[in-house]
């Protein structure tokens, strides 16, 4: 089975915002398949540099002239209707393709595993990819994060399968037609698009219902919303996973130490003999990451993965950039960068940090979007219980206007009123000094957020050293 349906004659494909983590993966796959790819972004970044090295032409800044000669332009939901390139393309009658539509076009030509869920998609997609490799499947991969084993968020494989991250944020994941659908969890998020939690629930149900009759869903029944979803699926095969005693792939005997997790998985699938894969090691912290690994194991086992192959692949798993990534240390304190920006994610990451630390856990948290902070304010006020100290930065606006009561000062005040003993405000200039007052041997400092706090996390070890 080969990529043949999308004609090369379509002309240069122009990606607006080509450096974004979602767009860059599709662009990289298309480049490696031989398509002519160009694009633009507001600034250069490692994704832009990687794509340029592969042959893409990338303009810095958005200008109408950038789309001259393009055969089609690809946009994500982050691109506003008044973007000059989008306006120019429509005026010139150049086809405009949504990101998910282009991803669906690539998926249409392969069997595909699509990983959905409010949290854990990127790590789970990465784990699925490396386990599919271990099963000899050689998948094409398009992910929402940099997979350490690939040095990229994408790769073209020679096999018949794909592993992709299915982004539910704007509902466009329903355009994807996969063979396998994984759902890790379902929490209230992206309400600016869905309006109500019931609409989001229905979207995930439709995501599973879109499977062909020969496909299957892999659903985490440790999560009440996903367990409810599983009960509604009547016409498609379902494999459940989790610590739930009723799960088809049950996590057992989980043990954690600072090097990672060791665990067993008991498989009890209809029509198969019960089997147990024992003493699997995953060099990642956190129960949430182990559950992601169980989802990947349950999926790849259906594609031919053996127990020995699973142990080798997971034991060598290098992780995903911005998922509990160590950026350095200072006086025995580890500095961690993590993408967690939703209260559920933050709580899971801090629980993992608590397991890794022999001392204190210090959270440096950059709220991402006023709307998210506003909609989930009470949850943000109570998700830092595993942190001894919380330093809150100004909100990363992502282009949003301020919302009354949803800002740095109000969050700090709310954390204190909810009983947190050491919650305070910090800034880019003050963060090193604020951390230095608190951090020491055996501590873990976790920089959390989906904005530019990742730059803070990588600069922090050097800035702390400069303080002495």
UniProtKB/Swiss-Prot annotation:
Swiss-Prot/TrEMBL catalytic activity: UDP-N-acetyl-alpha-D-muramate + L-alanine + ATP = UDP-N-acetyl-alpha-D-muramoyl-L-alanine + ADP + phosphate + H(+)
Transmembrane segments: none
Gene3D superfamilies in alphabetical order: Mur ligase, C-terminal domain, Mur-like, catalytic domain, NAD(P)-binding Rossmann-like Domain
Pathway annotation from the record: Cell wall biogenesis; peptidoglycan biosynthesis
GO molecular function, one term: ATP binding
Task of the protein: Cell wall formation.
Full protein name: UDP-N-acetylmuramate--L-alanine ligase
Organism whose genome encodes this protein: Maricaulis maris (strain MCS10) (Caulobacter maris)
Annotated gene: murC
């Amino acid at each position: 089975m080969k990529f043949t349906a999308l004609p090369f004659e379509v002309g240069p494909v122009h990606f607006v915002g080509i450096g974004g983590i979602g767009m860059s993966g599709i662009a990289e796959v298309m480049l490696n398949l031989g398509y002519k790819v160009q694009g633009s972004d507001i600034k250069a970044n490692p994704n832009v540099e990687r794509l340029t090295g592969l042959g893409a032409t990338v303009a810095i800044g958005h200008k109408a002239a950038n789309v001259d000669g393009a055969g089609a332009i690809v946009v994500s939901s982050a691109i506003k209707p008044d973007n000059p390139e989008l306006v120019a393309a429509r005026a010139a009658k150049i086809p405009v393709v949504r990101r998910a539509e282009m991803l669906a076009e690539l998926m249409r030509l392969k069997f595909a595993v699509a990983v959905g869920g409010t949290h854990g998609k990127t790590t789970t997609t990465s784990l699925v990819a490396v386990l599919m490799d271990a099963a000899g499947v050689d998948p094409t991969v398009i992910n929402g994060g940099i997979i350490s084993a690939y040095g990229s968020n994408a790769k073209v494989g020679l096999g018949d399968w794909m592993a992709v991250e299915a982004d539910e944020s704007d509902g466009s994941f329903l355009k994807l037609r996969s063979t396998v659908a994984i759902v890790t969890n379902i929490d209230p998020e992206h309400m600016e698009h869905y309006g109500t939690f019931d609409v989001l629930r229905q979207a995930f149900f439709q995501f599973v219902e879109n499977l062909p009759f020969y496909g299957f869903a892999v659903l985490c029944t440790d999560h009440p919303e996903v367990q409810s979803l599983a009960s509604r699926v009547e016409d498609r095969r379902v494999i459940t996973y989790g610590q739930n005693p009723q799960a088809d792939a049950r996590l057992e005997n989980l043990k954690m130490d600072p090097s990672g997790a060791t665990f067993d998985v008991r498989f009890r699938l209809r029509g198969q003999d019960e089997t147990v894969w024992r003493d699997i090691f995953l060099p990642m912290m956190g129960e949430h990451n182990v559950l992601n690994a169980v989802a990947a194991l349950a999926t790849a086992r259906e594609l031919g993965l053996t127990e020995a192959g699973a142990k080798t692949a997971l034991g060598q798993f290098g992780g995903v950039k911005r998922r509990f990534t160590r950026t350095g240390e200072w006086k025995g304190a580890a500095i961690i960068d993590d993408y967690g920006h939703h209260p559920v994610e933050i709580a899971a990451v801090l629980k993992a940090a608590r397991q890794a630390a022999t001392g204190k856990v210090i959270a440096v948290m950059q709220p991402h979007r006023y709307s998210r902070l506003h909609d989930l304010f009470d949850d943000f006020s109570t998700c830092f219980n595993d942190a001894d100290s919380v330093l809150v930065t100004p909100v990363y606006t992502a282009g949003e206007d301020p919302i009354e009561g949803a800002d740095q000062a109000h969050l700090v005040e709310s954390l204190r009123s909810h009983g947190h003993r050491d919650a305070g405000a910090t800034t880019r200039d003050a963060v090193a000094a604020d951390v230095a007052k608190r951090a020491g041997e055996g501590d873990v400092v976790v920089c959390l957020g989906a904005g530019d706090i990742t730059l803070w996390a990588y600069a922090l070890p050097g800035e702390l050293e400069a303080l002495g």
